[in-house]
Amino acid sequence: MPKVEIQLNLGENDYDPQEFVNAAVYGEELGFRTAWFGDHIFPWFHSGKRSSFVWSMLSVALEKTDRMKVGPWVTVPIGARYHPAIVAQAAATLDNMYPGRVLLGVGSGEALNERPFWNGTWPKWDERIERLIEGIRLIRMMWDSKEPFKFEGKYFSSDFYHLYTKPRRKIPILFSAIGKRAARYAGIYADQLITICPRNDIQRMKEVILPAYRQGRLEANKTGRGGVAIEVNFSFLTPEEIVRSQWRTLGIYHKDSWSIPNPVAVEEEGRRVTVDEVRKGTHFCSRWSELVEVIEQYAKIGVTAVSLYTGADRKLMRAVARNVLSVF
């Protein structure tokens, strides 16, 4: 069986911050080596009434665990909610205290969390991805440069940048990509690719996403196939049961969810999400062995890590450890 790491995705909604931290601690006790935290100022649905600051939780989770690697899935250093220099400092400070245990997932963002910081506007994807690429370049320069430097970019410029507290180890940058162009950019500019399924199903991953990612790595003269982490959305309910009982949380299934500006509007969109949309966005299983088979298929085409969303649900975490983690 191909080697693949099973990781936890704790998310950012549904629970209080201490519960997320405790979940990371419990995950380590269960044998997981990596836990991802969502990075939102607003949750995906309004009535959940929770959304905690990820960098606060990451620091406490690192202190309370011994070996667990943690990071944001994903942060958005495009100059709105976060300037790249702030992200560089935040990640470097954590790695300085907890070397080798910090991951940095980055992406181009969604309107839900970023639009309020653009004075009511929302840049097109092309601009956001340019900002992300330039932001990654600035972050790396701040980590690596031993002397102050001048930076003149299209979006970020200053005659003085210098990071005084450096990371102790190289911090992996994981680039979130849903489409072909972003996957290629992940190969060029980042250390690893992260994506979601079944939006990117086996066939699309094999024929579109992974070839584009590897082409990018080739263009950047990188060796090896590169790490690929994928979040597998799964459920043991039926699509009909989810639409009936969990409609408040379903706005993210909407095809334009990345452009919806606030959690009240996202939640309202959940009323209009169809059974077919839910079916296309989730791997539905009747037994754990079916989920294991899905993960095996992704591993065979080159996926190196699979992130499973559990939130801080200890019962679900135990079930994942017993039925999935133990297999791999």
Q: Where does each model-flagged region fall?
A:
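Active-site-adjacent structural elements that line small-molecule/cofactor binding pockets in enzymes
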Residues: 1-328
